[in-house]
Curated annotation (Swiss-Prot):
GO MF terms, alphabetically ordered: thiazole synthase activity
Location of the protein in the cell: Cytoplasm
Pathway terms, separated by semicolons: Cofactor biosynthesis; thiamine diphosphate biosynthesis
This protein's record includes keyword Coiled coil: no
Protein name per Swiss-Prot or TrEMBL: Thiazole synthase
E.C. designation(s): 2.8.1.10
Amino acid sequence: MIQTQSPPDALQIANRSFRSRLMTGTGKYRSFEVMRAAVAASGSEIVTVAVRRVQEGVPGHGGLGQELNWQKLWMLPNTAGAKSAEEAVRYAHFGREMAKILGQEDNHWVKLEVIPETKYLLPDPLGTLQAAETLIKQGFTVLPYINADFHLARRLWEMGCATVMPLGSPIGSGQGLQNAAAIALIIAESPVPVVVDAGIRTPSEACRAMEMGAAALLINTAIAQAEEPIAMGRAMGLATEAGRLAHQAGAIPVKTYASASSPLTGLVGSAVGS
């Protein structure tokens, strides 16, 4: 449920707080029924929706806006399909209107994606910067999807983006955290939440990203395309929680040599003269 007061260890983005640190998508599910159940099982409170696909009635997206309970979920419209900054800005406005129609009149959020080609689906840094600057001036809360590039991330948070969302590996690839070192650098320096987006395949990878200090994750394909999406949704939700708790708990340092877990003094046979 969308929070009006911050719960302990809430995910805080702009002026909103959430209990769950797992964001989910709505694409690639075999049915709306499975999607609803998987989102519920995950515990996710932020759900991203591809504005262009809903608007154009792409199979699996037509009527999507009415399939989820937006009184309990926060919509994150995304600009998937935008090949330029100009298209992204246009889709962002469509998304804001869609959120208003569905009852979220104060929702000015947008997951910004500018992807000019369809083979590799890698975000365009220049187009992203240009669109982000425009959208921030127009009053949007911008969550940009980017390559794991520290300098780009810094430009975006200095510009006023509410988060940065570096990719773990290409969208839908299931390659996991190929950019872990670069993401760790962004996490170490970012004053805004870092949301790892794209490429995560398994709950163990989700847990690892959270252990690194990510503020949240966005996972779609790994849940939607799993053999059992509902079970995978729950698994990803639990992994996100476990990774967050492990990060807060503080793992022991790696050591070169063994260190006994029980004291070696006072053992039988250790007395003088033995």
